[in-house]
């Protein structure tokens, strides 16, 4: 369902985008070409700031918004989703948020008031709250990354774990 917000803004949807008929796209939303928006997704740009300002929700070319995703912005803040990004089933993107190009956001993950660099992978059931993630950063499933998280130490921990896994699997490689 495509509909106006209370300010009268209608979504601008490229003719080559696909919007499932069960999805709700409301207000100042810009959908670029070759975007897929799946069943029961809700994308609402309808809440203004104290001065009546409302920034758009912009979804970049080739991006895929899967079933049940919710995008909404507090006080009219912007949401920008880059090109060729995938937001998986039932994820929530609550703005203001900026998500780069070629990003993967796993199912049931929550992004709030954050900036996600190009090429990041955020696995399933993760929460990113009030943070800036550098390009190509990896967030494991069920992680919570907030303002008090030292992402340098976090990144080193993930690297150490991955190295241990590689060494362990190389050791048993011939048994597999």
For the regions a language model picked out, list residue spans one by one.
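N-terminal segments that cap or nucleate solenoid repeat domains
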Residues: 1-40
């Amino acid at each position: 369902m495509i509909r106006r917000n209370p300010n009268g803004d209608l979504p601008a949807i490229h003719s080559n985008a696909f919007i499932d008929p069960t999805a709700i796209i409301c207000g100042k939303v810009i959908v670029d070409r070759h975007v897929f928006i799946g069943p029961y997704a809700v994308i609402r740009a309808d809440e203004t700031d104290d001065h009546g300002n409302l920034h758009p929700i912009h979804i970049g070319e080739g991006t895929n918004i899967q079933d049940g995703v919710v995008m909404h912005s507090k006080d009219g803040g912007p949401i920008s989703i880059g090109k060729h990004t995938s937001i998986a089933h039932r994820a929530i993107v609550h703005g203001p948020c900026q998500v780069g190009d070629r990003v993967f956001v796993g199912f049931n993950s929550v992004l709030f008031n954050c900036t996600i660099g190009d090429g990041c992978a955020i696995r399933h059931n993760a929460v990113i709250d009030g943070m800036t993630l550098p390009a190509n950063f990896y967030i494991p499933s069920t992680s919570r990354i907030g303002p008090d998280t030292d992402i340098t130490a976090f990144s080193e921990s993930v690297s150490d774990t991955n190295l241990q896994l590689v060494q362990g699997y190389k050791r048993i490689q011939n048994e597999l």
